[in-house]
Amino acid sequence: IEWRYAEGDIRAVFTQQARHTDLCVLAQGAGDNVPVGPSLNLPSDLVMSSGRPVLVVPWNWSGSHIGKRVVISWNGSKEATRALHDSMPILEKADAVKVITVGPEETRHIPGAETAQHLAQHGVNVEADHVIERDRSTAEAICDSVRDFGADLLVGGAWGHSRMLQTIMGGVTHDLLNNPPAPLFLSH
């Protein structure tokens, strides 16, 4: 672990520093510590611009460990693939990992089964599940799965729209960053 001090534009400084790390760890602000101004979107800006994985720890996280029970939110994208492989050192040491896919209806096969098989070949204790959205958003379905599994880490690909479109429409990454159910490991 290394701590650094730098001055300047917060986004530029963090992005530059993150490029020389294995993992950038940020705490989510809360209460009087809610970021304002340019640091408001720092976690999403950092994951999109640094080329490095980012771990966002919720302000109210009280767990004693991170990475023992892991949920991977899988959609088959290059971002999800990147997150999966960036988190491999954590996944290989985890007690239990669940790959979830989320969709509006039942499927004949579990879309994340191939991904789970790939992880099992790396010695990961893994299972796969398909979660039905029902009357909730994709982000809510993911959060429910994290809580139901007792996960202490959520791994996912940070898929981003332009800031304007994301402000208007939201987005799964945006929703998870605003209300993470557990520490959140993101890659882009």
Regions from the PLM with identified roles:
Residues 76-129, 140:
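Redox- and metal-dependent alpha/beta enzyme cores, enriched for Fe-S-associated oxidoreductases
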Residues 1-24, 121-154, 159-165, 174, ...:
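Structural beta-alpha unit
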Residues 5, 74-75, 103, 133:
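Conserved residues at beta->alpha junctions
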Residues 32-33, 104-109, 133-136, 162-163:
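Short, small-residue-enriched loops and turns at beta-alpha junctions
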Residues 6-9, 38, 79-82, 137, ...:
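Short secondary-structure boundary/capping elements
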Residues 12-101, 179-188:
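Intrinsically disordered or low-complexity boundary/linker segments at protein termini
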